[in-house]
Amino acid sequence: MKSINILAAVVFGTLSTLSATAEQVGEVGVDWVGNDIIIDAIRDPKVEGVTCHVAYFDRSLIDRLSNGNWFEDPSNASIACRQTGPIKVGDIDLSEDGEQVFRESRSIILKSLRIKRIFDEANQTLIYIAHAQELTEGSAKMSISTVPLYNATLAD
């Protein structure tokens, strides 16, 4: 039992250090019931000098009460990633599947907003894709942004 607890602590600690954190930088009210568009800044933890801004819809309590869906926010998100300083690429996943940079729950257990980074080696470009992942069904809602690696420092 002790080894399982140690393994769980190591896995949780590793996962929590790999995922970026979001910092809210904007909030736009869209109606009288309190629904908002939230804008977060997310720095890529393995690529210094790249920041992604993600906008998503945050439902108000009144909207949740009137629609009867208490525990879920919409999956829609928009992403824009830019160079915000000298780019220094760390040890990133180079596979076609890419690497998760950020994850945030959009419901109690079934849905999350995720940002993945994929490296396009032929074009020396980082591709960031924001998408919803649902336990019960897939979602076609996605948004991408690219950051070209002009004069970037790559990990050895």
Write out the residue ranges for each language-model feature:
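Bacterial N-terminal signal peptides that target proteins for export
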Residues: 1-8
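Bacterial N-terminal signal peptides
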Residues: 8-16
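Sec/Tat signal peptide C-region and signal peptidase I cleavage site
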Residues: 17-22
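Extracellular/luminal recognition modules and glycoprotein regions
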Residues: 23-45
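Residue-level detector of short, conserved catalytic/binding motifs and their immediate flanks
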Residues: 37, 50, 79, 126
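Residue-level signal for mature regions of secreted extracellular proteins and peptides
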Residues: 45-46, 74
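Mature extracytoplasmic domains of secretory-pathway proteins
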Residues: 51-120
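C-terminal partner/receptor-binding element of secreted or periplasmic proteins
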Residues: 122-156
